[in-house]
Amino acid sequence: MSKNERMVGISRRTLVKSTAIGSLALAAGGFSLPFTLRNAAAAVQQAREKVVWGACSVNCGSRCALRLHVKDNEVTWVETDNTGSDEYGNHQVRACLRGRSIRRRINHPDRLNYPMKRVGKRGEGKFERISWDEALDTIASSLKKTVEQYGNEAVYIQYSSGIVGGNMTRSSPSASAVKRLMNCYGGSLNQYGSYSTAQISCAMPYTYGSNDGNSTTDIENSKLVVMFGNNPAETRMSGGGITYLLEKAREKSNAKMIVIDPRYTDTAAGREDEWLPIRPGTDAALVAGIAWVLINENLVDQPFLDKYCVGYDEKTLPADAPKNGHYKAYILGEGDDKTAKTPQWASQITGIPEDRIIKLAREIGTAKPAYICQGWGPQRQANGELTARAIAMLPILTGNVGISGGNSGARESTYTITIERLPVLDNPVKTSISCFSWTDAIDHGPQMTAIRDGVRGKDKLDVPIKFIWNYAGNTLVNQHSDINKTHEILQDESKCEMIVVIENFMTSSAKYADILLPDLMTVEQEDIIPNDYAGNMGYLIFLQPVTSEKFERKPIYWILSEVAKRLGPDVYQKFTEGRTQEQWLQHLYAKMLAKDPALPSYDELKKMGIYKRKDPNGHFVAYKAFRDDPEANPLKTPSGKIEIYSSRLAEIARTWELEKDEVISPLPVYASTFEGWNSPERRTFPLQLFGFHYKSRTHSTYGNIDLLKAACRQEVWINPIDAQKRGIANGDMVRVFNHRGEVRLPAKVTPRILPGVSAMGQGAWHEANMSGDKIDHGGCVNTLTTLRPSPLAKGNPQHTNLVEIEKI
């Protein structure tokens, strides 16, 4: 057998094992590995005391299983899932470099070990150790005072995604134990949206009534895959295996893959058939140019549009819409703007050549089924709501919705085993704000209104935010926009009067705490974690404490139970219901078993560590029931159909207060934005800047692990053409700046990014002298981003920025 013949049959297990050993050799600087690796592993096996199942439950969503080897109450090394035969559709849930480095997080010398109170100014990071009693008494006293003086609407649970997978440990504010505690004590100000998906989650329901997409594995049945800003090789690189499933599904279908992105991503990386670099924020213009070709060359699915859609042309336009207010008129230039959306028009905006737009339109119009999807980068723009709905128009125009191998234009859906979560109870406070608007609510809350600021539940806020819970999240500073402005707001103690931070490390956000509490990590306590982004295989992971509690670190449930005691016996009883954390897990799992008898018992799951189950329906096809019978299975839109023209959006556009450069439209149109590709500000700040998810971090989690920082340097990507103009060579230290702030970091000069565009991995820890020059040496992109929200969702537009870059 030849060498080539042997390589054809290489397994995923062998490949990963061999590359892992090779990586170790490289990390050791060329040090030769011994050939007694197997014997050494056996020796370690004999010496260890136990292996404990854990999970990495940070907000990449992959939620990978970990097998932690423990000796003398210390984690000595980490491996990942090794169960099953590891085949397509039933693969091992393997961790990436982040999860595999969790030992370095657990044993990190900078772990928080004791309760502390602030003794300097907020943001200085000056604290002194206090007892748990003092910390808990202070929190309870401040909470009582806030509620008595301002009411429960003045209490806010900060957006957090540091622990998204946990049940008892989950940090998502709408589903956390903190939310349950506050609902036992009169409630707190609600929030809507997310930093990840605010615009698409808001916009897509106006079209479809929901935000569903076909599963990745359904690409087995596709002839063409078109990905707008979707980069699972970095955003969903492990665990559930979206990247792996994408490649295996394409092997089966031989589908052509076209990647549309300003950056040549790892999802492309030689696997794509074509990369089309596009200016950030112009995806809707590309869609319009494609639509012009589809319409003029009779490539639209007219029967589908007539039967299932509202507002494509005059035939299905709602009665309350203006004449020529339909989508076809907009594309052909017969609408209000009198501009035909030709490929030439689209090319001038997007930077994609006219002939390539025409070719792409014909490919989309003739390849059926076509899987057209979008990641969450395109929607994280100031015009992101319009972009999300616009991309959905391509499968709508071509009739690819509701069929196997097609898609809705949304991101891929996944099969998940539904778990019974800790009930948070009802919130007596019905007012809510966008999760991105909390700094406004601190600074000028009573001035925030429903029609200008997106306040829901009442016409305006009555009080500003005075008390903040910040549990397992870095959005207080690092992941929020315009850090310098946010610093000014938080440092003013007359505004927000109490900030409680519950954390593992002294993060950028923790420095602003008044009371700082040391939390256990998820792997240090008992919990059950379900999969999230995992194709058509769901799983549950049972976490057991990897070590005993160390120093004075405590689990979140204990912390909140102790606060509840201090708020009154009725609050304590309502919060705990007389149960410990373990008893809650057993109680909730019993409810799961009652609904899903196929699950293993609690003790069996605990012994197994991980339980896997394939989707019994095979591939998930979004809106299939609607496609099969639209009358029996209407969508959750007012018409029950796909609403290309939304009367609800027309009413919002008519009644809301908007800035002159903001657009809310009943149609999925293209609109330019502030700090966009054609902004006058480009004369001063000529480069567009966006952030991307970096493989060494999940947002900011793992951002303090030295090994990962060394392996994946924080850099600003810049095209060679732009670099040459500025005298910048690869690796040069540069300053990236605009009117909001300045960041200093190395330059990555690469043709993998479009000229006129720059990019930085988001989530790097902010490092600046906030009482001095405020220059960020950590490379945090949010030093440069804006607090101005998007028009409809009031979401974060952290990819809409203009900067200049100069060599230092």
Swiss-Prot record:
This is Putative dimethyl sulfoxide reductase chain YnfE. It holds the Pfam family Molybdopterin. Its EC number is 1.8.99.-. Its main location: membrane. PANTHER family: DIMETHYL SULFOXIDE REDUCTASE CHAIN YNFE-RELATED, TRIMETHYLAMINE-N-OXIDE REDUCTASE. It is a peripheral membrane protein. GO terms for biological process: anaerobic respiration. Mo-bis(molybdopterin guanine dinucleotide) binds at residue 196. Its cofactor is [4Fe-4S] cluster; Mo-bis(molybdopterin guanine dinucleotide). GO terms for molecular function: 4 iron, 4 sulfur cluster binding; dimethyl sulfoxide reductase activity; electron transfer activity; molybdenum ion binding; molybdopterin cofactor binding; selenate reductase activity. [4Fe-4S] cluster binds at residues 56, 60, 64, 96. Terminal reductase during anaerobic growth on various sulfoxide and N-oxide compounds. It comes from the Bacteria. Keywords: 4Fe-4S, Cell membrane, Iron, Iron-sulfur, Membrane, Metal-binding, Molybdenum, Oxidoreductase, Signal. Residues 1-43 form the signal peptide. Coiled coil: none annotated.
